Amino acid sequence: MARKALIEKAKRTPKFKVRAYTRCVRCGRARSVYRFFGLCRICLRELAHKGQLPGVRKASW
C-alpha cells in the first residue's frame, strides 16, 4: 500500500516544480527511471528482451 500511495502522490502537481520526480509507470519504482520510456531500468530490460518496445535493439559495435 505504501508504494500505491507514493504513486498517487507523484501524480499530483507539486507546489514547486523542483519537487516533481519520475516514477516507473509499470511498477512504481522511483530510482533509475528513463524519462523517454517512463520505465525503470528493470522493466525496460524485461520489455526489450520480449521485443515489446519498438525500435529498441541490442547494442553491437
UniProtKB/Swiss-Prot annotation:
InterPro entries associated with the record: Ribosomal_uS14, Ribosomal_uS14_bact, Ribosomal_uS14_CS, Ribosomal_uS14_sf
Family assignment from sequence similarity: Belongs to the universal ribosomal protein uS14 family. Zinc-binding uS14 subfamily.
Superkingdom in the source lineage: Bacteria
Stated name of the protein: Small ribosomal subunit protein uS14
Cofactor note: Binds 1 zinc ion per subunit.
Gene of this entry: rpsZ
Record's GO cellular component terms: cytoplasm; small ribosomal subunit
Protein's job: Required for the assembly of 30S particles and may also be responsible for determining the conformation of the 16S rRNA at the A site. Binds 16S rRNA in center of the 30S subunit head.
Keyword Metal-binding: yes
